[in-house]
Amino acid sequence: VVLVPELDVRALEASLHFYAEVLEFRILFERSAERFAYLEHDGVELMLQEAAGPGRRFRTAPLESPYGRGVNFQLCVADVDAVHTRTVSSGAKIVVPIEERWYPIDVAVSAGRWQVTGPTEVGNRQFVLADPDGYLWRPFRDLGIRPADDSA
């Protein structure tokens, strides 16, 4: 199973510049007549469609800015600090400053790297930024799993 989000954007060129320069996505292909692009970054695939362009639409309500309310996209990267530096240099809006954050895991899990039997935390070095249309992205580096800190 592969999940490939398609995001409506106001200006395809501005969005392509942002995704290529800040988040290092590469353009796999474009359908210029439809104002559409298909992007990829280390196995993560993403589609962009210009909202006012002639392409096909899947909407349940009028589109209002900022787009993407109620969702953020978490993107695992090798060097979150480099992504943060590019974000600052680009002038993109940083919503949550870079941080190390540990999240509690309340239940036992046994799947893949998640071998959790007691009170545990999973950590990220992360920040949240907004793309030109207001979609929120959370680049992060996985800090691993540790026993929960009972002093918190």
Where are these regions (language model features)?
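Conserved beta-strand-loop-alpha-helix junction that forms the acyl-donor binding cleft
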Residues: 9-11
